[in-house]
Amino acid sequence: KMYEPASVQIEEVVFAEVQEGRIADLTGNINIVGDIRDHYQMVSKKFGIQDDNVHSFHAGIHPGCSYDTTAQADPDRWSNTVFTNPRVLHFHTCGDYAPGEICWMVIDHTLSVDGKNLWQDGRMCLDDFNATRQCLEDWPELKAMFAEPAQAIGLGNEAI
């Protein structure tokens, strides 16, 4: 589905509180939060869908994925490309179906599974889990890629 504007530029950190699969609150700069809320309302009204739904999320697992141009040059292309990089945690929101209509991109996230970090600051912790460690043993060419994953994700500050 297409709509304009396709995205909202967020210049400062905005926090989203999610409860039981719904966006309960957004906090941050009042003007930016207002722009985000307006965008959600516009999209939900256009398609007759629930605006506060958080459908699903996934983190990137492709250490070779890079994006060498800027996110600002084409935000839609950026969000549909860079989500496979391990530095990116990608949420599907707005609508009760995959992938939803609005995505969130969380950069350099930490994600824990059963109390252990599977991602730490945007890097996968592959040696800490039997299944991922086994993948590195079965396909040793992956070990080098994960040891030095691509850092370029179109944001200009690519060092982590």
Predicted regions and their residues:
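Metal/cofactor-centered catalytic core regions of large enzymes
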Residues: K1-I160
